[in-house]
UniProtKB/Swiss-Prot annotation:
Modified residues (Phosphoserine): 3, 19, 92, 106, 108, 112, 163, 186, 513, 626
Name used for this protein in its record: Kinesin-like protein KIF2C
SUPFAM superfamilies in alphabetical order: P-loop containing nucleoside triphosphate hydrolases
Outcome after substituting residue 112 to A: Increased frequency of metaphase figures
Effect upon mutating residue 106 to E: Altered localization, reduced microtubule depolymerizing activity and increased frequency of prometaphase figures
Chain positions recorded as ATP binding sites: 258, 342-349
Principal location listed in the UniProt entry: cytoplasm
Keywords: ATP-binding, Cell cycle, Cell division, Centromere, Chromosome, Chromosome partition, Coiled coil, Cytoplasm, Cytoskeleton, Kinetochore, Microtubule, Mitosis, Nucleotide-binding, Nucleus, Phosphoprotein, Ubl conjugation
Length: 718
């Protein structure tokens, strides 16, 4: 076999076998001794085609080349006398091979040689050795009828002397080559074995690295592997946090994010911090994930905002870059609004109202008090002193679509539009204040009355939107207004401790108002002609803050750093990102990637999961639509029922008057009967209307209950 390359040269005509089994002649174009293969070419359909063939396949299909080489001593043994060799009739080997397909004939491009040759090679390695090779050589010797010459004599013979007998020996010789287990492996098989060995070595190295890392970290610590990945990632980034010395920037819409430190409950559970704030406008969320094979990895998602505050930032730092620039706006006759948004327990009330100690609050260290102090400082300056401005404050909350005055014993208020299409909060009390201390007293009074509830993240969560307004009036006329809003937590209804109707209605109203608020802020930032402020009570009350050229808004997104709150943190950041949609590229250098993973992701499995999630979201969206429709119908019918009830109550003094009439000794009976009939007619109408509204309200409540059960069952199946 070693001398076979010496007998192969360019231009030599040999037989080859195609991938479809067809055998035909082809000319050798090149001989590659290093790869142990030859390149052949042939003409087919007017096109020149070619492929590469291993030396082993050349020898198998062209046995006459092997006969010219020195034979093994076993091949020279004499034939046994009792063995009869049947005479084989000459026949064409091609007769049993199917004709090539039309698609193969019409291909004009050069054929790829790898799949054709390697399939046979892999099959040959799996076969066992059969005693066919010896028989085939014996048949060849008998057929020639000549004794085997020595090698020197055979080297001078031309190939044409043995070409006639070669055609009959194609199939036996092919079997001989197939049955040889010591056959040389192809190049691709060798490469595959090398790749396999490299994979095994890499797995062994990774296993050793994991063992070493496990020794460095406390394995009993929950999520220690994710903690190690986050620590390794943070080493690669440079941190430049925001400080009081950094310059402020003016934005019509300013979107900021604030990260709070881990609280006592999270530290007790040994939770890890999954938020990194490397610069004044950039934030990373290290989302823990698992592959299909349960391999842990991180998906580091980047978000860019106007300002990003880490856990070391104080309320003073946050106020300086968020609400303080807005105070100047109201003295210039504008409307300013500052929102605190986020999950319950993320620090919204702490940021807006001040430090919390149990149920008591130090309101002097919140944005409410800081803004009021700056208002009085600016009011005392000479440029604004001549305006003779008076400072008024209001404090109210919006709970379940209803407005309550926190400074007037939580009286219920009505939101109506006047003839000038201006939204008026009927019954809201405005209180004149002369200094910042008066404001702090009002804040303490209103904060004590605010509605709270229990949620997944906070046992004493604010379940209402609290709006504290500072109004500047000049001779009774509104000059400017600053609205500071502490929004309710953005948990879903399924995340609350109780799943009763009140909780569901509460969560649905919160989500509805938050979506409406986002669209109003986006319309303000994009200078749209239409602002959808009628979608919720919150945006109705703050309507004048979203219209006009001199309107400015700031949103502070509050996030929790714990790994258990990662999903809610991402929801908060996506909501805030949709408000302004800043690109994270602006806060990153060219060398820093947007998303980094510690392990390779499985593209196929991710694609499948995305498709499944999309289908599940479609099913949930239809059920959510039915639920929201039922909730809207309940609120509408509830308002109608309250109106009918008020009408009935207003008729109460009329019945009392009739009763007092009968106490007089000389009352007119005719007058009594007429008034009683009139009152009964009016009351009957109101009672009938109230009865119909109550029936419709009962049906709407049943539909809401059914839609809620369908959503919960769907979530449990997921």
């Amino acid at each position: 076999m070693e001398s076979l390359p010496a007998r192969l040269f360019p231009g030599l005509s040999i037989k080859i076998q195609r991938s479809n089994g067809l055998i035909h002649s082809a000319n050798i174009s090149t001989v590659n001794v290093e790869k142990s293969c030859v390149s052949v070419e042939w003409i087919e359909g007017g096109n020149t085609k070619g492929k590469e063939i291993d030396f082993d396949d050349v020898a198998a299909i062209n046995p006459e080349l092997l006969q010219l080489l020195p034979l093994h001593p076993k091949d020279n043994l004499p034939l046994q006398e009792n063995v009869t060799v049947p005479k084989q009739k000459r026949r064409s080997v091609n007769s049993k091979i199917p004709a090539p397909k039309e698609g193969l004939r019409s291909r004009s491009t050069r054929m790829s040689t790898v799949p054709e040759v390697r399939i046979a090679t892999q099959e040959n390695e799996m076969e066992v050795e059969l005693p066919v090779a010896t028989n085939s050589r014996k048949q060849f010797s008998v057929a020639t009828g000549l004794p085997r010459p020595s090698c020197p004599a055979m080297t001078e013979l031309p190939l044409s002397m043995v070409s006639e007998e070669a055609e009959e020996q194609v199939h036996p010789t092919r079997s001989t080559s197939s049955a040889n287990p010591a056959r040389r492996k192809s190049c691709i098989v060798k490469e595959m074995e090398k790749m396999k060995n490299k994979r095994e070595e890499k797995r062994a190295q990774n296993s050793e690295i994991r063992i070493k890392r496990a020794q460095e970290y406390d394995s009993s610590f929950p999520n220690w592997e994710f903690a190690r990945m986050i620590k390794e990632f943070r080493v690669t980034i440079e941190c430049h946090p925001l400080t009081l010395t950094d310059p402020t920037e003016e934005h019509r819409i300013c979107v900021c994010v604030r990260k709070r430190p881990l609280n006592k409950q999270e530290l007790a559970k040994k939770e890890i911090d999954v938020i990194s704030v490397p610069s004044k406008c950039l934030l990373f969320v290290h989302e823990p994930k698992l592959k299909v094979d349960l391999t842990k990895y991180l998906e580091n998602q980047a978000f860019c905002f106007d300002f990003a505050f880490d856990e070391t930032a104080s309320n003073e730092v946050v106020y300086r870059f968020t609400a303080r620039p807005l105070v100047q706006t109201i003295f210039e006759g504008g409307k300013a609004t500052c929102f605190a948004y986020g999950q319950t327990g993320s620090g919204k009330t702490h940021t807006m109202g001040g430090d919390l100690s149990g149920k008591s609050q130090n309101t002097s260290k919140g944005i409410y008090a800081m803004a009021s102090r700056d208002v009085f400082l600016l009011k005392s300056q000479p440029r604004y002193r001549n305006l003779n401005l008076e400072v008024y404050v209001t404090f109210f909350e919006i709970y379940n679509g209803k407005v309550f005055d926190l400074l007037n014993k939580k009286a219920k208020l009505r939101v109506l539009e006047d003839s000038k299409q201006q939204v008026q909060v009927v019954g809201l009390q405005e209180y004149l204040v002369n200094c910042a201390d008066d404001v702090i007293k009002m804040l303490n009074m209103g904060s004590a009355c605010r509605t709270s509830g229990q949620t997944f993240a906070n046992s004493n969560s604010s379940r209402s939107h609290a709006c504290f307004q500072i109004l500047l009036r000049a001779k009774g006329r509104l000059h400017g207004k600053f609205s500071l809003v502490d929004l309710a937590g953005n948990e879903r209804g399924a995340d609350t401790s109780s799943a009763d109707r009140q909780t569901r209605m509460e969560g649905a109203e919160i989500n509805k108002s938050l979506l409406a608020l986002k669209e109003c802020i986006r319309a303000l930032g994009q200078n749209k002609a239409h602002t959808p402020f009628r979608e919720s009570k919150l945006t109705q009350v703050l309507r004048d803050s979203f219209i006009g050229e001199n309107s400015r808004t700031c949103m502070i997104a509050m996030i929790s750093p714990g790994i258990s709150s990662c999903e809610y943190t991402l929801n908060t950041l996506r909501y805030a990102d949709r408000v302004k949609e800043l690109s994270p590229h602006s806060g990153l250098s060219g060398e820093q990637p947007i998303q980094m993973e510690t392990e390779e992701m499985e593209a196929s499995s991710n694609g499948t999961s995305l498709a499944v999630n999309f289908k599940e979201e479609e099913e949930l969206s239809s059920q959510m639509s039915s639920f929201n429709e039922a909730m809207s119908q309940i609120r509408e019918l509830e308002e109608r029922a309250m109106e009918e009830l008020r009408e009935i109550i207003q008729q109460g003094p009329g019945w009392l008057e009739l009763s007092e009439m009968t106490d007089q000794p000389d009352y007119d009976l005719e007058t009594f009967v007429n008034k009683a009939e009139s009152a009964l007619t009016q009351q009957t109408k109101h009672f009938s209307a109230l009865r119909e509204v109550i029936k419709a309200l009962r049906v709407a409540m049943q539909l809401e209950e059914q839609a809620s059960k369908q959503m919960n069952s769907k979530k449990r199946h997921q």
